[in-house]
């Protein structure tokens, strides 16, 4: 399964919970959230566009850092 790394503007536990919520709702993903470094690593067959769109539902600034 491809692994992708994203930067997400998370400042607190609530922010990371929002990321977890939208990714779990999408399904078909395994992910690790690195709150101090504001990064999310996602293992998924979904396209980068779908993952970006999903992460943007949190209302946070999101950018794709590349394959991990």
Swiss-Prot record:
Q: Name one GO biological process term.
A: copper ion transport
| Listed InterPro entries | Copper_transport_ATOX1-like, Heavy-metal-associated_CS, HMA_dom, HMA_dom_sf
Residues modified as Phosphoserine are 47
The GO terms describing molecular function are: copper chaperone activity; metal ion binding
Q: Which UniProt keywords apply?
A: Acetylation, Chaperone, Copper, Copper transport, Ion transport, Metal-binding, Phosphoprotein, Transport
Q: Which GO terms describe its cellular component?
A: cytosol
Where Cu cation binds, per the record, is at 12, 15
Q: Which domain of life is it from?
A: Eukaryota
Residue ranges of the HMA domain? 1-63
Q: Which residues carry this modification: N6-acetyllysine?
A: 60
Q: What is known of its domains?
A: The heavy-metal-associated domain (HMA) coordinates a Cu(+) ion via the cysteine residues within the CXXC motif. The transfer of Cu(+) ion from ATOX1 to ATP7A involves the formation of a three-coordinate Cu(+)-bridged heterodimer where the metal is shared between the two metal binding sites of ATOX1 and ATP7A. The Cu(+) ion appears to switch between two coordination modes, forming two links with one protein and one with the other. Cisplatin, a chemotherapeutic drug, can bind the CXXC motif and hinder the release of Cu(+) ion.
What the record says about family reads: Belongs to the ATX1 family.
Summary of the function given for this chain in its UniProt record: Binds and deliver cytosolic copper to the copper ATPase proteins. May be important in cellular antioxidant defense.
Q: How does it assemble?
A: Homodimer. Interacts with ATP7B. Interacts with ATP7A. Interacts (via dimer form) with SLC31A1 (via C-terminal domain); this interaction improves ATOX1 stability and controls intracellular Cu(I) levels.
Protein's UniProt name: Copper transport protein ATOX1
**Gene (name only):** ATOX1
